Every structure is written in C-alpha cells, then in structure tokens.
Amino acid sequence: MGFPADMPSPERNNLRILAFLVIALVAAVSAFLAVYILDGDGGGGAEAQTVREYNLEIVATDIDYGGGNVWHAWTYKEVGAEKGTVPGPTLEVTVGEKLKVNVTNKLDKAHSFHTHFSNYDIESDGSQINIITQKGAGAMIPPGESWTYEFEPTHPGILYYHCHSADGGNTISQHIHQGLYGGIVVKDPSEPPVRDEVIFMSEIGFDTEGDQIPPYIMNGMGLPGGERALEDAYAAGGFDAVASQFNKTVPVITAKVGEEMHVHVVNIGDLIHSFHAHNVDHISLGTLRGDTWAGNLLPMVPGQADTLQFTFTKPGPWLFHCHVVAHADAGMIGLFNIVEDTGTATQPP
C-alpha cells in the first residue's frame, strides 16, 4: 500500500527528525553555528541540501597591546562570545552546502557583510548596489538591524568577508581596516580533513591611543620594532619576557613536526605585502595549483589570497613575517611553534 501524495514518506520523516536533532544539538552547544538538512522539493527535482548557518554581531572591541596602547576596533563577533576579534570568526563551509550568515549590527553606523563568492542573489551583496537599486537595501545594515546573507560555494579554497559600508564619514577602506574582516574556508568534500589556519595581513585602523601602536598587523597583532623588539625583551627579562608577547602582540600558531596545515594568507590591506615563513616549503594550492613559490615567498597585492600547504620537518620556534622588511621592523611578525609529535600540541599563553 502506497502513501498518499501529500503525506511524507517514512524516509522523509526520518530526514526531518534527523535535521531537528542536529539543530537541537548544535544550538545547545553554540549560538554561533547551526548545521541542518534542507529537504528537497519532494517532486524528484532538488535534492536535500546541508545548510551551514552562522550568527554574527558587529560590535566595538578594544584590543589592548599593553603599556597604554589600545586599538578601539570594530569587529565581527560570534553570538555568545564575550567580545569580537580581528580578524572575525573563520567560517567554514563545504562545496555543495548552502552558507547562511545572519548578521546583527550593534554599532551606530551602517555596516555590512560582503564576500567574494560568485553566483549569489543581489540581496546578499552587502554593498552600495543594494541601496541604489533598493533590492535588499537592508543588506547595508542600519544600526540595530539584522540581515541574512546566503551563498552556495562552487569551488574550494580561501575567500573572505568584509564590511562594504562608507557610512559615518568613513571610507570603505577605513571600515575594513578598523577590523571588519574575516576568512571563509571552503572545503572540498572529496578531500580528507586537514588543519586550517588563517592569517590576515593589514594596516591598522584609525581609532587608536598610545605611542607604540603597530602600523602594520597580522591577525590584529603587531610588535613595534619587530624582531629587534624580541631581542630587547629577551635581554631585559629572558624568555618569559618574550613569551609575554605571545598572542598579544605576536601571533603564535602551534603545530607538530610532520603535521600538514593549510595556511590561508590574505592581504586585506591597501599596501603590497609579502609573506615568508622560515624553514618550510611554501606550496601554493591556490594561485600556483601545487607548485612552490620561488624563494619560499608569497607576494601579495592588496586583496590577494592564497592557500599554502605547510609541513614543518624540524621542531622549534620559526618566524613568519612580511618580507617588505620595513613592515616586519614595524611589527609584522609572528611565530610557528613546532613541537615534536609526543602528544597534543597546546597553544602558548
């Protein structure tokens, strides 16, 4: 005996139950991300599709570099998190899934969420086009309002999001450099899982206080004086003085010897930067499709992004920095902390 045409089959009911359980489970864990299954049309057309839904807020966040040096940044924040970050939360999605991003603007200027995806509806553009066409005008989010942006990624790799507003007498560039940017990692469903790390290179925003503010930053951090400042800290207080700067002014990424990482590097700034890490081959999975960058140096024009496959073969702290050396001297430095594979690596304080 068949089912009436208007009655879902047991299989479709099970799919809905599974989707409900997944939503309930993820919602209990995090208000930031929900993953669920969207039914097909039931008529043999569209198939069921996984939806990855993120919830973000745009908020003010003070980034304290110590010694009275503070950046009053604008940031994207995970709903439920204590404060925002620069860069904003990294969003992950797999080719074939739908990405939904719900954004609430909690600042006193209009802001938006613009990506470099393709093949999306104009209502998800998050630019001035939404205002002048009045199609999805709310995508340029007024203070206190929210908007949902939807995308369907077609190929894997690194993309990013940023504010596209020029509200409040500030330029689009100023909105971005004030901290409103973040990464989107699009995964290949046919590839095995791999560790992802995202590094943004940029100039710092305009709203700062203190006389030791880094002009150039990586992942929101910078140490004026660069590597020489690390030498001076060691001379003054030993390694503890150096370690006190870890993930405060100097970004540190800990990994194991032999561990493969995909390091996604983005130049979100208006200047030419370059990226170099010590003692590792810079295999380009994006721009060069698997070839190694000559000189193990990734050149980066403004807006450029690439994915580097890194596998360190020797333990130790290994520097990474902008190889426009004046930028490194001004603070654009970081460390890969590579440890022997004797247990789980932990991030330094």
Model regions and ranges:
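Secretory targeting signatures
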Residues: 1-48
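N-terminal, post-signal-peptide metal-ligating segments of extracellular/periplasmic oxidoreductases
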Residues: 36-123, 127-128, 133-146, 179, ...
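Hydrophobic beta-strand segments within beta-rich accessory/binding domains
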Residues: 101-103, 163, 263-265, 275, ...
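Extracellular/periplasmic metallocenter environments
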Residues: 107-111, 118-121, 129-192, 298-349
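Extracytoplasmic low-complexity repetitive segments enriched in small/polar residues
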Residues: 87-89, 97, 196, 200-205, ...
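A short beta-turn/strand-edge loop motif at beta-sheet boundaries
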Residues: 112, 273-274
